[in-house]
Amino acid sequence: MAKTTEIAEQKANTALAIMSDLEQDAGMGFENMNQEDYALPFLRLLTSTSPEVGEMDGAMPGMVLNTVTGELYDGKKGIMVVPCAYIRQYIEWAPRGQGSGAPVHVYPATSDILSQTHREPGDNKDYLDNGNYIENTANHYVMVIDADGVPNPALIVMKSTQLKKSRKWNSMMQSVKMTGKNGLFTPPMYSQVYRLTTAAESNDKGKWYGWEIERVGAVESNDVYLSCKQFAQSVGAGDVKVKHEGADGAGAGNGSQPF
């Protein structure tokens, strides 16, 4: 019994020593990395046509995929996120199966590029004369809060049928009010936690899964709040780089959705 206790104490002391060294060496090895060296995960809705369904263990339509870690989230249970920043863009794509899978061009929301497009009969895509098409794309930069309360950055892209969800979310965020010493004010976007779940949707073109958004309440952890604020500032400064992929790569979208 005494020997067992002694071994347990030795293991505990070793663990404490290792933890002390880890803390002392925090961040070492990452000195030469910047934003160009990291991949910002996309949180992507899986549909029946998503390549991961049938290829990745456990992947099912309606789930949410972290494109960097490969983590799958149950769409019914949802994920907890803190929205940190929002950028809308017009993205020019080559027709499916053509090009590199990367955007041909990314235009700011202030661009008049849509005035240079047209639509084909029975097709709601906005085509340029060169055959490429433009997608109105809403980018929601979020912190995903895991079960331990740890925040991790990610990007949710909403387009096509999900643009109305994006507008609804923006309105929800803008409607949050708090009372300060000078009266009512709108708190920063990254002050609130939201639960995102998925639900089946359809129209005469087909079926897919879409987002459902519910406000949970205010961020309670100061560490989480500061992490979200820092992420928001990085996005605002242009330091967060996004590598969109087209429908073939599926990195930027929510799977194939009817228009």
Which residues fall in each region the model found?
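Extended serine/threonine-enriched, polar tracts that run as long, contiguous segments within proteins
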Residues: 136-216
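OB-fold ssDNA-binding interfaces and closely related basic DNA-contact patches used
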Residues: 1-152, 203-204, 210, 218, ...
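Accessory, usually C-terminal, subdomains that scaffold auxiliary metal cofactors
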Residues: 181-188, 192-193, 197-258
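Generic structural signal of hydrophobic/aromatic residues within well-ordered alpha-helices
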Residues: 42, 169-176, 224-235
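Intrinsic-disorder-associated interaction segments
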Residues: 80, 162-165, 221-225
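Surface-exposed polar/charged interaction patches
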Residues: 22-25, 49, 179, 234, ...
